[in-house]
Amino acid sequence: MWTDERGSEVLDPPECRRLLAIGAKEHLPGHLAVADGSVPLVLPLDYSVHESDIIVRVGEGLFSSLVDRLVAFEVDGRVGHQGLRGIEDVCEWSVLAQGLATEVKAASLGRYLPQPRVAEPGHRLVRIRTDVLTGRRLHPAGS
């Protein structure tokens, strides 16, 4: 990992995968981006991670807009830790995955199904490959 010209720590793919898994375990919402016709659409979704892929649950309408298309999926998180003089510092992170979305059957996922927090999350499962995986970690100024 290295620091870019703006002071953000650039994360390597293994660290991005680790943070995606933490985000899923902590039920952080992800944001799915897809072009719906000529209009970009970004939706918050619960997700899970299976192997190196992202799994989301969607309804029929969105399903037809996603399957066999390139999409983007983004997750943000915050981590607090003890800093100098006992003050808690918070660093923030963001991971962006880009890849092909395909249908997946629940039977092939076992315990890796997304755990939705909404009453009607949809019944179709979509696998998003992490063909391109990038991330940044932002540290507090002066740390």
What are these regions (language model features)?
Residues M1-G23:
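Extreme N-terminal tail/first-helix region
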Residues W2-E9, A107, R127-R129, L133-S143:
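Short, charged, intrinsically disordered terminal tails
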Residues A21-G30, D36-G37, V79-E92:
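Intrinsically disordered, low-complexity coil segments
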Residues E26-G59:
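Short beta-strand segments
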Residues V49-E51, K105, T134:
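A generic structural motif
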Residues I54, A101, L133:
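Short beta-strand segments in beta-sandwich/barrel cores
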Residues V56-V58, F73, G135:
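Short hydrophobic/aromatic-rich beta-strand segments that constitute the beta-sheet cores
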Residues E60-R124, T130:
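Short, structured beta-strand-loop surface elements
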